Amino acid sequence: SPSTRCGTTGLRPTYGRVTRSGAMALSWSMDKVGPLCRSATDCAIVFDAIRGLDVADKTLLDAGFTYPGEVDLSSLRIGYFKSDFDDDYEVSKFDKQTLRTLKKLGAELIPVELDNDDLPYYAMSIILEAEAAAAFDELTRSDRDSLLVSQHRYAWPNKFRIARYITAVEYIQA
């Protein structure tokens, strides 16, 4: 997520709350548009300004929004996938800091262990990567994806190339 990579606070709103009209989608069926800000309060202010109906995006709901500001987290139990926080990766320090902050604010953190078979990651990755490959098809077919700086195994240009082999059946079943 972009906020994790730059150390800011991000809000990924529920699908249908903020227009995607004019945004460059990576995955048209899963993408959401939300603010990147200095704090949760700033995110709430920006979200309140950008939410709502747009004639160019028929997926939107006109639902109210209130943000109380100060919230007592001591009554919250927050589950997190422990295995996702065990590894050291490029932005793991931000993820681990989030857990420490939630605990400091009084939330009860509950590590959850699930088999990979129980997680929808595979289905989500098929959808995300197939739609991203379609969105960036012209970039891939013209070989301009080779101009992108990051070319490691899991970089987007390689995901675009590999996703061209996802069948329609796999995509629909995901």
Question: Which stretches of residues belong to each language-model region?
Answer:
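FAD-binding core of FAD-dependent oxidoreductases
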Residues: 1-10
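Conserved strand-to-helix beginnings and helix N-cap segments that scaffold or border functional pockets
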Residues: 2, 89-92, 122
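A short helix-breaking turn/cap at a secondary-structure junction
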Residues: 9-97, 142, 146
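Beta-strand segments within the central parallel beta-sheet cores of soluble alpha/beta enzyme folds
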Residues: 59-62, 112-114, 152
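Short, surface-exposed loop/helix-turn segments at secondary-structure junctions
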Residues: 60-61, 123, 173
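Acyltransferase
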Residues: 90-115, 136-147, 171-173
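Acidic helix-start/capping segments at beta-turn-to-alpha-helix junctions
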Residues: 115-127
